[in-house]
Amino acid sequence: MTFARHNPVLTLAAVAVVAFTAAFAALTLANRSSSPPAGPPAVANGTAPARSTDARIRQLQAEVHAAPKEAGGWALLGDAYLQKVRETGDASFYTRADGVLKRALALSPNNVDALVGAGTLALARHDFATGLRYGEAARRAAPSLVRPLGVIVDAQVELGRYREAARTLNRMVALKPNLASYARVSYFRELHGDLGGALQAMRYAVSAGGGTPENVGYVQTLLGNLELALGHTAAARLAYGQALAGVPRYVPASVGLARVEAGERNYGPAIRRLRAAVGRLPLPEYVVALGETEHAAGRTAAARRDLALVGAEERLLQANGVNTDVDLALFEANHGEPARGVALARRALAAAPSVRSADALGWSLTRAGNPAAGLRWAKRALRLGSADPAFLYHAGMTARAAGRTALGKRRLRRALARNPRFSPLYAPRARAALR
């Protein structure tokens, strides 16, 4: 198999654009003890019973109190705090993780768990260069372990170092073809426009299973996202339902179901589901999804009220060390001050020259009234062959605004062909632009 079937440098020996890179790094932490399957698994293994993260935190806190000079205990506590962020969206746990991981590294600078944890934390905060440094340090400390490779490949992808990421993925899958490695293969293929291959790899990830129910629910949700991107709404519903069966009230899966409902113009249930999701996990991307769905439903005043919350949520993340430049740039381009979006996107691109940063800059420039400059960055955003309808929509509207009408129409048609319901707000605008 290959990571990207049309690129000869991306070969894979054994085997969604995901907005939060740390999710993959956390999968590496959570799957540290899973044994690799003999080949692509045929049947889902389900999830083993697991203690709650709160219980794990309490136990580890007691252990480090009893043995404060043991670096391993502090590293595991940092791991548990990072898992808590995944489950609650409470970014203050990043600050707690930072403190205990620094203590672990002060006690033992070459402790692999602490180095991987510190790299995961850096990725969660979108400090990809620092994440890469910690990942490389962990690999030097333990060359035969797979866990450092997850941190390294996530950082390489976000830094736009895709050829290096392909080589790292080859090694990771060869060492341990498990949930964490299959999920990364899926994302890498998705970035290169190979949604069929991405779907196949994500099915392997789900089948491989893992010891943490939330992690299994997460990859089941990613599987649903890929099915939805391919227009397979029934399969998407099934995947989201399986995630919710394993992790009741799991917010990412609930948001996925809301996206299905919004795509079917079933706005009432979608809005209710999104509002409940935001109440439990008020991440900016969920608030934006709620506001845009309300816009599509004609509830303009409610949309304005909800979108006004995004800035507050972003500030909370920033207060806990999270760099939100790309996400905030797109928000400003769509709903705020596009000129500020340009500044944020330029800063994001300087720190991490990925296709995501290029897309954010191209769209921000277009929305700020400079589509000619935006066109160049839209082309860079598509350079891997992405089939992401959002990228294609941005590129199509940019080309149209720059006077490249035929090019714009081709890109908009590609976006709608990939998924005619990719957004309750922007898919109708794409269709209107083609009329």
Positions of PLM-derived features:
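Residue-level recognition of tetratricopeptide repeat
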Residues: 79, 86, 120, 154, ...
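Short coil turns that delineate tetratricopeptide repeat
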Residues: 68, 109, 143, 176-177, ...
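Canonical tetratricopeptide repeat
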Residues: 76, 117, 151, 184-185, ...
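N-terminal leader/linker segments that initiate helical-solenoid repeat arrays
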Residues: 2-107, 112, 133, 420-421, ...
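Structural motif corresponding to the intra-repeat A-B loop/turn of tetratricopeptide repeats
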Residues: 84, 88-91, 125, 159, ...
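TPR alpha-solenoid repeat register
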Residues: 73, 114, 148, 181-182, ...
